[in-house]
Amino acid sequence: MRDTGKVLQLLRKKNKSRGYIVQRRLQLAQIGHKPFDIRIIAQRKKGVSSRWSVTGSYAKVAKQGYLVTNVASRTIPVPQALKLAQIGNRSLLARAERIALQAAKRLGERYPTLRQVGFDIGIDRNQRIWIIEGNYQPDLRPFRLLKDPSMLRKIVWYKHH
């Protein structure tokens, strides 16, 4: 649906008096005409004063015809995704990681027992970085699809320390 007025009318009809949030559509960078986003895991060890670290990341490529990556066709390492999309290099990943760490730090100040957040990060066609959402219990299964198991081992280690 492209008509914003019709979308709002439909939401009002379906939700009646309940509130709702409409998320802005991002023109995500693409690989082979399929949008992708990045999952970045930020964790810290036990103890409120522990520093946040990025312990893993991967890219989720949407299935053909989908605008969102919830239905991913494949999971690949982020450097490979950036290369295939021809939008940047490791410095773009470093920027996304810094943003995820800043967000995790702020969330940790508000929720002192929080030790893990999985951020879905979008990169648009102009290399702007967007936090799509953060998950306190991110799905770690996609890390098993990567050839290198070191990130998953690191994530699991942080969960137990």
Which residues does each PLM region occupy?
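Short histidine-centered catalytic/ligand-binding loop motif
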Residues: M1, S73-A94
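Phosphate-binding site of ATP-dependent enzymes
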Residues: M1-T75
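N-terminal start-of-chain detector that recognizes signal peptides
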Residues: Q9-N15, R90-R95, A103
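Short solvent-exposed loop/turn micro-motifs enriched in small/polar/acidic residues
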Residues: H33-P35, T113-Q116
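Internal, well-ordered alpha-helical scaffold/interface segments
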Residues: I38, T55, A94, R98-L101
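Glycine-rich loops and low-complexity Gly/Arg-rich segments
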Residues: K45-R51, G65-N70, V78-A85, F143-D148, ...
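C-terminal active-site "lid" helix and adjoining low-complexity regulatory extension at the edge
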Residues: S91-A94, R98, K105, R110-L114, ...
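Hydrophobic residue at the +6 position relative to the catalytic HRD Asp in the kinase catalytic loop
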Residues: F119-I121
